[in-house]
Amino acid sequence: MMTIDFIAFYNKVSSIALNFPGTIASTSYRTPAFKVGKKMFARFKEDGKTLVVYTEERDKWMKQDPATFFITDHYKNYPAMLIDLAMVSKKDLKQLLFTSWQIRAPKRLLKK
């Protein structure tokens, strides 16, 4: 997974995610992840260029740009979506990471 692209993608995601209260860099399923409290809210897939986030609006995102926002059968029954980090804008990535953080964050952090 350690490629030049992955390093750039990791830096892109971490520069946003680590600014949210209570966020730590961690791992999940042996890949880099970001957690709030003990809950993962974003993680890299094994390919190093796809990110998993939680969202309640995935249909909207996938309809808007199916090349960038998608799911696999594994995520069909979860409120999660995959993001192609080579395609996503920084604005959309920031919005999706923040929404995912809000879904997973403890209530005490949401008040900050």
Q: Could you say what each language-model-derived stretch is?
A:
Residues 1-112:
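Charge-dense, helix-prone N-terminal extensions
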